[in-house]
Amino acid sequence: MTIGSAPSLSTRRFAAFGGVHLVGDVGGDARGASVILLHGGGQTRHSWGAATSALAARGYYIVALDLRGHGDSEWAPDANYGIDAQIGDMHAVIREMPSPPVLVGASMGGLVSLTTTGESAPHLVRALVLVDVTPRVDPAGRARIIGFMRDRPGGFASIEEAADAVAAYLPHRPRPKDLTGLRRNLRQRASGRWYWHLGPEIF
């Protein structure tokens, strides 16, 4: 495979902590260095966009994972989304990797990566990459995020309405013209309305 080619990714289910099954996009060379990508809270594995395919094209073995309760991964039947359950999930996925992985985590995924690395035997994790993670959590910032995610219990009438809500929440960022990424973080229910694609107890 040459750099710049577009490797195919397959979707895989992982049996994780407490009987919950996680879903990830998997691809690349199993003989190469292993990398697990973990998204932020309220997002999905698709948040990594083209990075997943780009890393696979460069010879890495990639797993872009939906955390429990997010995306296509199962919701915890006991609503257990605590850090111990997340670490248990990561240990289950790491056991399925062909080599000790590099954990790359953004925001909440970074905290899961960090605590997993700290709670694991040294040989289980090769390296740690943190994106948008701080040493301390700002209570006001956390409350703002939770408030935004809970603000629309009735969902959105359209993807465009969801995009308007995100743009109002993040006025310093330009509203994207391509809403494909946002679409992957939403699911349309039988009512026709769009909802965040995550377990209701997460926020």
Describe each model-derived feature in a short phrase.
Residues 1-14, 25:
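An N-terminal hydrophobic leader/cap segment in hydrolases
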Residues 17-27:
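A short loop-to-beta-strand scaffold at the N-terminal edge of the catalytic core in hydrolase folds
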Residues 25-74:
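Conserved HGGG/HGGXW glycine-rich cap/lid loop of the alpha/beta-hydrolase fold
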Residues 84-101:
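Conserved acidic catalytic loop of the alpha/beta-hydrolase fold
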Residues 98-139:
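Conserved hydrolase catalytic core segment
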Residues 134-159:
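A catalytic-pocket lid/entrance helix-loop region that shapes and gates access to the active site
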Residues 157-203:
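Conserved alpha/beta-hydrolase catalytic His-Asp/Glu region
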